[in-house]
């Protein structure tokens, strides 16, 4: 009897060991994904949260009209699991979108447009040059926000001294950690791809004007920098767009948007496709 009990105990010990190993294997090797595709917007877009003056009409998302002193934002309705506290893993992600800035003329344009990653309870911040995402040019870790800005108006307090319109990567401050001069093509569609490589912590931005008629000018731009997302943003975030106007103005519109993220070492997945 004792021998049988010993064998049973050994069997259960081996079984539990195999079970725990299997659970750990799948836990470590599973991947949580979030995906969505919006090829065109609709007036009753269900998967967006609108803030300020943001709204959708047939085929486009309008963040601001070409009027003074406005702030408009739109967030994807579901939170994104951008890093995992238990494993320390960070998600790889790529997002692409097409946007248009329409101003009455190409000289008096303000203030700009961003794609941003922020806490789940994010609210519109200061307008004007702060682009509805930040409140200060000083680094503030409590902001917990990363943004890619497409800045159309020079602000001497924090913008590059060359006074150019620019693309910038912002981390907890409206003062960009890196910038690239950018020539706005008023009324032209711009295609943007933003990708984050979790292995290197490199955030890369590319912008192209596919239908540009300005053959003598640069029509594509690339910018990158190291951003440690895990040290900046919360584990769960919202993603979205923001745009502002001031004394000068423009309409800021998004025509399409896709997003895909993969976070390894977790056990759930979420996918969505929206036409």
From Swiss-Prot:
Glycosylation sites noted in the Swiss-Prot or TrEMBL record: 217
Record keywords, A-Z: Calcium, Glycoprotein, Lectin, Manganese, Mannose-binding, Metal-binding, Signal
GO molecular function: D-mannose binding; metal ion binding
N-terminal signal peptide: 1-30
Keyword Lipoprotein assigned: no
Family that this chain belongs to: Belongs to the leguminous lectin family.
Protein name per the record: Lectin
Protein's organism: Pisum sativum
Gene that encodes it: LECA
